Regions:
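Phosphate/nucleotide-binding beta-alpha loop and adjacent structural elements of enzyme active sites
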Residues: 1-167
């Protein structure tokens, strides 16, 4: 358990976002079962998500925390890596992690898809460009390794952002 780091894992019943509060979350259902991987916060949503193949949705009121606030509250003094896959809400999660990103310079593995970002009025460039301006390099998994890329394409969904000299 110690070698795997499992003792440091904490499960929290909260969503991540730009600031603490309570927000509405949409939870899609398919064949009567919840599709948790497609759940998304409605904060700032400009249009409903595409009902790809779900038959209904449920609206939940959930606690939202910012990464910066969470780290301060739990005495976390080092963040090396963040995986953010939140159905288009990635920029808002990063907004709530601004101090953590600037001080710790963690590697960031982000799902970036215009079809999800669009519901919040954003594009892939709106998400990737500010990270590059902060000195992050962008990579995509290609032929068994992380390869440097300059833009987001529809051929890939996940992109690794690493501070210069960090990969």
């Amino acid at each position: 358990r110690r070698a795997s780091g499992a003792g440091r894992i904490r499960v929290n019943n909260a969503a991540l976002g730009p600031a603490p509060g309570r927000e509405l979350m949409t939870l899609p259902y398919r064949f009567g079962l919840p599709i948790h991987g497609w759940a998304h916060l409605r904060t700032g949503q400009r249009r409903p998500g595409r009902p790809i193949s779900f038959s209904s949705t449920r609206t939940l009121k959930v606690e939202v925390r910012g990464v910066d606030e969470y780290c301060e509250d739990h005495g976390i003094d080092r963040v090396a890596f963040m995986k953010v896959d939140v159905e288009g809400f990635e920029a808002r999660v990063l907004e709530g992690a601004a101090r953590t990103i600037d001080s710790h310079r963690p590697s960031l593995l982000l799902e970036i898809e215009d079809r999800h970002l669009d519901k919040y009025g954003m594009t892939s460039a709106d998400l990737a460009d500010p990270l590059r301006e902060r000195g992050y390099l962008m990579y995509a998994w290609h032929r068994g390794r992380w390869a440097r890329v300059n833009s987001v394409t529809t051929a890939r969904r996940n992109y690794l952002f690493a501070a210069q000299g960090g990969l």
